[in-house]
């Protein structure tokens, strides 16, 4: 069962696990684990998507319980009236508090987008980011005897495909576990030494005006076990108090960590 973060007569929000598709497409119509169908079966109602999260990303996913609710939510997302906050663990020490305004060329899928225009101009893409913590671990990566990581808070101001992943890669601080835009040696090292085998990007919080009641609404999603183990091993527990979970302990994974 999926964790229900919020539900009322109009909306439902869940904590999407990493690795789950939001909905099926013709490319993955045989996929058995899909958020929309799982939520529908779980609450006994059809749900309507208003935004999406990449398959490897975890966190808050908000849906409507009617087509009208889905439409109103989608409009708020399109007009950037919903504030989104993410957290990521990245390569290196990213300590800035800044805004990156870096247009992105549309990222096309070779199969799904084979009929799309190839001459599209880069689209505006803006991300606010803030470094929260850094650490240097005594594990080698490539030719370096130690490995540096950073904990970063992100607020996308636009909604381009893979925007956060591509923007952080542009800053030379790719997200750990990003197989497409990241550092494969860093990914292998994080998997080997810290049991970190997922994209370390989490949609932590949505802040919006309820599209039916007009009241302020804040929805937050807790971190999964992998995130909690890494925060513990890096000495970062307590830095994300709204998202950390007390039920996950590091004992089982700490025994597997081999620092040199």
UniProtKB/Swiss-Prot annotation:
Positions of the catalytic residues: 54
Example GO molecular function: tRNA pseudouridine(65) synthase activity
Record-listed E.C. numbers: 5.4.99.26
Transferase found in the keyword field: no
Top-level EC class as recorded in UniProt: isomerase
Pfam families: PseudoU_synth_2 (PF00849)
Record Gene3D superfamilies: Pseudouridine synthase (3.30.2350.10)
CDD domains named in the record: PseudoU_synth_TruC
InterPro entries (UniProt xref): PsdUridine_synth_cat_dom_sf, PsdUridine_synth_RluA-like_CS, PsdUridine_synth_RsuA/RluA, RluA_PseudoU_synthase
GO BP annotation list: enzyme-directed rRNA pseudouridine synthesis; tRNA processing
Keywords assigned by UniProt, alphabetized: Isomerase, tRNA processing
Chemical reaction(s) catalysed: uridine(65) in tRNA = pseudouridine(65) in tRNA
Family: Belongs to the pseudouridine synthase RluA family.
Chain's role: Responsible for synthesis of pseudouridine from uracil-65 in transfer RNAs.
NCBIfam families: PRK11112.1
Protein name per the record: tRNA pseudouridine synthase C
Species, as recorded: Salmonella typhi
Gene symbol of the encoding locus: truC
């Amino acid at each position: 069962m999926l964790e229900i973060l919020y539900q009322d007569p109009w909306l439902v929000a869940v904590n999407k696990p990493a690795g789950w598709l939001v909905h099926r497409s013709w490319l993955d119509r045989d996929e058995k684990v899909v958020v929309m169908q799982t939520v529908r079966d779980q609450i006994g109602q059809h749900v309507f998507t208003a935004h999406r999260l990449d398959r490897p990303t975890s966190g808050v996913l908000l849906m409507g319980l009617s087509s009208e609710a889905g439409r109103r939510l989608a409009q708020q997302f399109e007009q950037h009236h919903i504030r989104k906050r993410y957290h990521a663990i990245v390569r290196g020490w990213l300590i800035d508090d800044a805004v990156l305004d870096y247009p992105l060329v549309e990222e096309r899928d070779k199969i799904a987008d084979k009929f799309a225009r190839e001459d599209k101009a880069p689209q505006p893409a803006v991300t606010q980011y803030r470094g929260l913590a850094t650490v240097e671990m005594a594990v080698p990566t490539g030719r370096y005897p130690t490995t540096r990581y950073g904990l970063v808070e992100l607020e996308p101001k636009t909604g381009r495909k893979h925007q956060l992943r591509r923007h952080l890669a542009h800053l030379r601080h790719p997200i750990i576990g990003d197989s497409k835009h990241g550092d494969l040696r860093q990914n292998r090292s994080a998997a080997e030494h810290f049991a970190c085998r997922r994209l370390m990007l989490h949609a932590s919080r949505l802040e919006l005006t309820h599209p039916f009641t007009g009241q302020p609404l804040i929805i937050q999603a807790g971190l999964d076990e992998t995130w909690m183990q890494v925060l513990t091993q890096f000495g970062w527990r307590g830095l994300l108090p709204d998202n950390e979970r007390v039920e996950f302990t590091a004992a089982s994974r700490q025994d597997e960590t081999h620092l040199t």
